[in-house]
Amino acid sequence: MIIGHKRILDFLKKSVANKHLAHAYLFAGPSHLGKRRVATEFIKMLNGQEAGENIDPDVLIVEPEILEKEGVIKELEIGISQARRIQHQMSLFPYQASYKIALIDRAGRMTREASNCLLKTLEEPTGKAILILITSNSRLLLPTIVSRCQLINFLPVKESEIKKGISDKSLDDKTLSQIVRLSNGRPGLAIQYLNDQSLLEDQNKIISQLEKLLRMDINDRYQYVEKIAKDVPKARQILNYWLFWFRDLLLLGTGCPDLVLYSQALPYKGSYSLPKLKKIIQTIKKTDWYLSNSSINARLALEVLMLEI
């Protein structure tokens, strides 16, 4: 099920119908907007069937692998060997479908070597091959890669569309409205909350933990960091919730209380100056970027953040 993005879907349908296709597409926008779902639908438009997880000989799906080692969970980078698989895929003629397709999810996780290998593929496109890249931040890609792709920007979806898309008779209107509001224009999050409402409780626990953290001394903060740094994907999820909490404080400080997501932020109105809040938000974003890079020490990056908040 795809919620929203009608303009993008109509554009892709028209491109397929008119056979006016680019050799490469870049689907860019914040996480949980539905970029992967739209990409899968696009592949179905092109080849007339669902994109299986690498069971279709004409479709190759590449994404970062998750590694757990000595109790530490990390998302690996997309390396040169995976880029060469893509290069090989794009050099072949379709086996039974109309196009050879390679989809790279979280393309910003490519190493420099992998990026350069992919660039060579883009510089020598073949007529029956299409590459789809998905990223939450196009600035993580080489500018030369971005310039060779048809850029498709994904924007947050209207609350009314999300509410209609996830309408569930088993939910009371208050819970449904809460899910829609907390999704903040991201249908993927709304679906996650709908399928597992314990995530709403987890989110509240994370915000409560943040409130406690703000009252801790630096040694206790570092102990907390040592714990969460062992699971980098989870740590990034925590940072995302923190980001919206501090964003709420910024909204309160600028006279926009109706846009606040977390009611827990209300008592903290005025606790930080606006310049300080902007700096904290920038630091959280920077820390999240550091955590997305598996070569950077996650614990060190989080400790630096503790000094800022």
Listing of model-derived features with the role each one plays in the protein:
Residues 105-106, 133-138:
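A short beta-strand-to-loop transition that corresponds to the Sensor-1 phosphate-sensing loop
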Residues 1-113:
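Clamp-loader machinery-focused feature within the broader ASCE/P-loop NTPase space
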Residues 88, 120, 147:
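Conserved adenine-binding aromatic site and its adjacent loop/helix in ATP-hydrolyzing domains
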Residues 109, 124, 140:
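Residues immediately C-terminal
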Residues 91, 116-133:
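Conserved catalytic/switch belt of AAA+ P-loop NTPases
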Residues 1-45, 49-51, 127-129, 137-241, ...:
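Charged, glycine-rich active-site and insertion segments that engage polyanionic ligands
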